[in-house]
Design a protein with these regions (language model features):
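Extended hydrophobic leader/signal-anchor segments used for secretion and membrane insertion
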Residues: 1-143
């Protein structure tokens, strides 16, 4: 499961945005290991959104998943990578008070690009908004 190695530990009312880093493969192809995230804390969550939440059993651990649907008791969240696990199929619905915010932007750090073509490719793909994907939500719900 992608856990977040950093959290901007600020109060929601003071700073509504924070940065985080993805570790793990569960959100591939949407997010990859090493991606940096811009998170909007306290934002309204809709089905299909990529969200940051506290793990239901280890609340000091932050994870990033896709919100599939709101059920009784909280959000049903799933990983985009069905082989990685670590989502609601393992721990059930996630209470709404454990959902911290929505991922608004994904940016990739400048890696070891060795050719001019690789550098140009990085420039055009380094920062992208993470949009709500309702089709992914329906597709994941069918799993």
């Amino acid at each position: 499961m992608p856990e977040l190695s950093q959290e901007a530990g600020r109060a929601k009312a003071l700073v509504p945005f924070g940065a985080a880093e993805v570790t793990g493969p569960s959100m591939v192809p949407t997010l990859e290991h090493g991606d940096r995230l811009l998170v909007r804390y306290g934002a309204r969550v809709r089905p299909g959104d990529v969200i940051v939440l506290r793990h239901p059993f280890q609340q000091d651990l932050l994870v990033v998943k896709r919100a599939v649907e709101l059920r009784d008791g909280g959000w049903w969240v799933l990983a985009d990578n069905p082989y990685a696990g670590g989502d609601s199929t393992d721990y059930g619905t996630v209470p709404e008070d454990l959902v911290l915010g929505r991922v608004r932007l994904r940016y990739r750090p400048l890696g070891g690009q060795r050719t001019p073509f690789a550098l140009v490719r990085w420039v055009f793909s380094a920062a992208r908004p993470v949009r709500c994907d309702r089709s992914a939500s329906r597709r994941l719900r069918a799993r």
